[in-house]
Regions:
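Extracytoplasmic/secretory-pathway segments with low complexity and glycosylation-like composition
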Residues: 2-4, 12-16, 21-129
């Protein structure tokens, strides 16, 4: 009887240990590095914890948006682990200096009626002359 109690206690501890160690699924993250960049210098955009499910596409659309303009950076494929990386260089004459937002958008569908639901994340990027 005592042996059964010890075995159950150890099994409970193991279950609890794995439950604590398992990563929690959270919202998608977007990061931009560096946050301040000069024209004609490289910028790296990274995403993590983006959904990889049947209702979402695997391609994220990346844009630069300011108060007056919007510029398509390109697209990046979400890997099986929910991450993506894209590098770009803001070119002189195409993008002006100032405060911009890097916008990542992933198209998903509603599981009920198939209507589009977009997952959008934004990060500020300061472009210097």
């Amino acid at each position: 009887m005592r042996r059964l109690a010890v075995t159950l206690a150890l099994a409970g501890c193991l279950v609890l240990a794995f439950a604590v160690a398992a990563p929690a699924a959270g919202p998608p993250f977007l990061s931009v590095s560096p946050k301040r960049v000069h024209l004609d210098h490289k910028v790296t955009i990274k995403g993590s914890q983006w959904p990889v499910i049947e209702f979402c596409r695997r391609t994220v659309r990346l844009r630069l948006e300011s108060a007056q303009n919007a510029v398509l950076i390109g697209f990046s494929r979400v890997k099986d682990n929910g991450r993506f990386t894209r590098q770009f260089t803001p070119k002189t004459g195409k993008i002006g200096p100032g405060k911009w937002k890097v916008v990542a958008r992933l198209r998903c569908e509603s599981g009920e009626d198939g209507s589009p639901n977009f997952i959008v994340r934004r990060k500020t990027l300061r472009i210097l002359p």
